[in-house]
Amino acid sequence: MIITIFGPPGSGKGTQSSLLIERYNLKLISVGDLLRNIISSGSELGKKIKDTVESGNLIQDGVICELLYDQLALMDDNFLFDGFPRNLNQAHFLTQILRERYNRDVDIVIELQLNDKVAIDRLKNRLVCLDCKSVYSTSSFKDDNNLVCTRCKSARLEKRIDDSDLSAIDRRIGEYHVQVKSLREYYRDKLLMIDANLNVDQVKQEIESKISCSLV
């Protein structure tokens, strides 16, 4: 099975992706994680990507597609794309590379739909565990001096660099709304629209229910 999941910033793509790969025994391909790994390497490309991300702009398609091309060379044909494709050009690339490598296409496309105000509130308060990638809200912790991941017990919880600037957040959300219209049309026969304003368990249940119906 090949699944792709996309949605605006703060919609819970990473959280739901983690649940989906466990539920359906899939490998995860996260564009965000790939980019963050390059940034943390301190390379020239990493510095350029860091500057782009901090300004709220999107990474060039060529960079994204090259990363995905290399990653797919290491995978079989059961995986989930977290946060990809982000525009129609990337969708065409994905269709082409899947047909070349596996003679197939994406089976299920999940769009997480989220109110803009909710997205902004989530992003302003988001913390991410640097070790296991679990996501938290600052409101989950009573003591700001005792931030510990409940999953892996790491104390390395930090804000993402692209969550620190409100104007950058607004640009990311605005760009998403521009690009998602063409993605909906391109994937209209495979698209599952999910209300991401709900809590994590409710979103998980809605996704699994709609996947079950689509596979009948």
Swiss-Prot record:
GO terms for cellular component: cytoplasm. It is found in: Cytoplasm. It comes from Wolbachia sp. subsp. Brugia malayi (strain TRS). PROSITE patterns: ADENYLATE_KINASE. This is Adenylate kinase. Residues 30-59 are annotated as: NMP. Its main location: cytoplasm. GO terms for biological process: AMP salvage. Residues 125-163 are annotated as: LID. Belongs to the adenylate kinase family. It catalyses: AMP + ATP = 2 ADP. Pathway: Purine metabolism; AMP biosynthesis via salvage pathway; AMP from ADP: step 1/1.
